[in-house]
Amino acid sequence: MLQSLFKKVFGSRNERLVKQYLQKVKAINALEPAMEQLSDAELAGKTADFKARIEQGTSLDTLLPEAFAVVREAARRVLGLRHYDVQMVGGMVLHDGKIAEMRTGEGKTLMATLPAYLNALAGKGVHVVTVNDYLARRDAEWMGRVYGFLGLTTGVNLSHMPHAEKQAAYAADITYGTNNEYGFDYLRDNMVFEVGEKVQRPLAFGVIDEVDSILIDEARTPLIISGQSEENTALYQQVNLVPPRLTRQKDEESEGDYSVDEKSRQVLLSEAGHEKVEEILTEMGLLQPGGSLYDASNIMLMHHVYAALRAHALFFKDQHYVVQNGEVVIVDEFTGRLMSGRRWSEGLHQAVEAKEGVAIQKENQTLASITFQNFFRMYEKLSGMTGTADTEAFEFQSIYGLETVVIPTHRPMIRKDEHDQVYRTGRERDQAVINDVRACHERGQPVLVGTTSIEANEKLSAELKKAGLPHNVLNAKQHASEAEVIAQAGLPGAVTIATNMAGRGTDIVLGGSIQKEVDAIRNDAALADGEKDARITALKADWQTRHDAVLAAGGLHIIGTERHESRRVDNQLRGRSGRQGDPGSSRFFLSLEDPLLRIFASDRVAAIMNRLKMPEGEAIEHPWVTRAIENAQRKVEQRNFDIRKQLLEYDDVSNDQRKVIYEQRNELLASVEIGDTIRAMRYDVLGETIDQHIAPGSMDEQWDVAGLEKTLAAQFTLELPLRQWLDEDKTLNEEGLRKKILAAADAAYAEKEALVGAEGLRRFERAVMLQSLDTHWREHLSALDHLRQGIHLRGYAQKQPKQEYKREAFELFSAMLAAIKAEVTQITTTVQVRAPEDVQAVELHEEPSNVQYEHAGYDEGADFAAAESAEAAPSGPVHVGPKVGRNDPCPCGSGKKYKQCHGKLA
């Protein structure tokens, strides 16, 4: 109550911020008359003037009013579009590193030119991030005309682009590209063997379009670059025969072999199920008679069984994936788009391929990986824009430190959002949707029907065909024609069925879009200018008639056939209507069979329906029902937020390690001289080897001299007469012997340098170091994956899984660094380098075969949210000998802490 009173008196923080920005807009507007008086050359010359002032120490904030006024005038001259005051406010919000929530159709693309131009003046590069290649290309071409007019360069960064073109795109002042491509380029840059092969500059300023989709929806799906491992794929086909022979439990009390937890997307075998699976596998010859699935030797078999169960019970054709040209292609659950070239990890994709009877591709080994959360947090300054961010404002603030500012609309929003109608069955709901579509079509009102899956999309399309209603279908299968279909969805009486957010980023113009026809007439060289103008005028008059007819019919009507887990996605669907003050309406038709209602609210609503004795085909419609559904969505949103937060906390561990490895790698690439590093590593490794045979401070009688001689010869090709040295010099103590061994190793290495030359040996050292670093890092990523999958089970032992993960991940990392040190020392001391050709042979690094850019599984993170999962995880790496804590004394006996001795690389 006090809070609402405070808001009434002082206004909300959002209102106060917008008021402050509007004061700055007045200053920008005051400059407009002066800008209009400038010639094109004078206006374009402002860019050089701004850059000179920045060099003299003027801040971007000081330049903002003038720079924004320049961009507004340039856009008016080049595109015929003038930035509204609210777009100026949005531009300032983005420049300040915040998120601008701006309604659909309010001109986010044009708004982004303001902060992009201003920040590009600093010369560090600006990245505009979009959700697909089509939007990146469209926006770069469209807005690039404004930047080009003002003397700035624009690049577009697309997938499968040649290396030289990518470098040119990143060298431009402003680069447009997709979130995936920026992330993959970062990972690829950290896999190169020469500095000149890199494409990205340091990450300075990023503007993310559809920021909610990228930083929230896709935050659980890491970007993974992987190569194929040598694994037997026949096992997937054999294990695929197991799930059809098992019985699913209907509920917790009923009998069955396995249960499916839809909330956490897990499949769990019952006791009876375990026994039955063991019987089937024994019968197939995959399990030894009397063997158990829990035997250490059968861990991978267990992994295959669960992958097959998930493929059969949780992933369905035309909903989670489609089969195209003999391949299983993932459907993005948030956008409904096909994700060609992406594969689920952990053997799930192969299990789905086995289920569908298509060729099984080998399982992948992770070469590099990063989450969008950690990638985008590396930008010096980050901002975003979307039509729907307010519901997730807390998450943006807590995870990314980004404040959300709601920008007022240019014109008042008059769309009418009706209450949800809930039906008992999906059949009744579909009939109600068809009746509503028919009514809209007959009165000439365009209608957009949103579905949550391709399966529902095609099913509804078949029903509409049966009812004789003409319509356009838009889902991932029609990806190529997406923008065209959406652009014409505003024609009088048009019926369009689209999956979730297909066509996002393209406006639905009431009366249909005529831009394509206008461009065709303008570009027709056979027509005289007068004829062109006459045709365009006639075209516009015809469009105006259609536009007025649609307005009279009530504008665009939105029908939702199912509530999404997130209110934001529902708001995005609604937001397609009522753009820029246009009329419109929306309604959701639901059934008790929908996943959200079935899991969270069906019993309560069904009880109300029974109590009211509602006949078949009758819907329940009440603000209470709408509120109950929104509460269910809030619960799911909160749970998903908790999962993302948990995942981030786990991923931060590997992210810290990634930073160390990539920093080390970049230093190696940039440095010419790494001889000192190699020498320090050699001394460390030889020191450890000596310690194993001659313990520090031990008596002469305890020394294993013969064993040390043998080890030095075998591992480092150092044939040293240690016994002879000791016999000849009775005063030679442990320290003296150590010095002689290290001196002999240095002398042997100097001989190698004399043979091949200092420059050749440095190149050899660098190549060995890079390859060893990469190989061990890949193995480490795989070990971390295995550790992470089973870590939640530590909760049963009254241990904190997160703390255990941090501790073991550090131990793995320390072991990896020690292994790199040992391997590099062994290779550099044992490999015979006699000529420059030998160096070149080492430098010819083998490129990973069949590299793929992978999309991680949907169920990732469910383990952290629900420790009830009894799924056995693959065994983690085996540790030999006692584990050493980070702050414990180093076992080598140096007296230093482990982290300051053998716990670091060099």
UniProtKB/Swiss-Prot annotation:
Example GO molecular function: metal ion binding
Residues where ATP binds: Q87, G105, E106, G107, K108, T109, D507
A matching Pfam family: SecA_PP_bind
SMART domains referenced in this protein's UniProt entry, alphabetically: SecA_DEAD, SecA_PP_bind
Reactions the enzyme catalyzes: ATP + H2O + cellular proteinSide 1 = ADP + phosphate + cellular proteinSide 2
GO cellular component, one term: plasma membrane
Gene Ontology terms: biological process: intracellular protein transmembrane transport; protein import; protein targeting; protein transport by the Sec complex
Membrane topology (UniProt): Peripheral membrane protein
Main location group: membrane
Residues that bind Zn(2+): C890, C892, C901, H902
Taxonomic superkingdom: Bacteria
Function: Part of the Sec protein translocase complex. Interacts with the SecYEG preprotein conducting channel. Has a central role in coupling the hydrolysis of ATP to the transfer of proteins into and across the cell membrane, serving both as a receptor for the preprotein-SecB complex and as an ATP-driven molecular motor driving the stepwise translocation of polypeptide chains across the membrane.
Subunit structure: Monomer and homodimer. Part of the essential Sec protein translocation apparatus which comprises SecA, SecYEG and auxiliary proteins SecDF-YajC and YidC.
Name recorded for this polypeptide: Protein translocase subunit SecA
Protein source organism: Thiobacillus denitrificans (strain ATCC 25259 / T1)
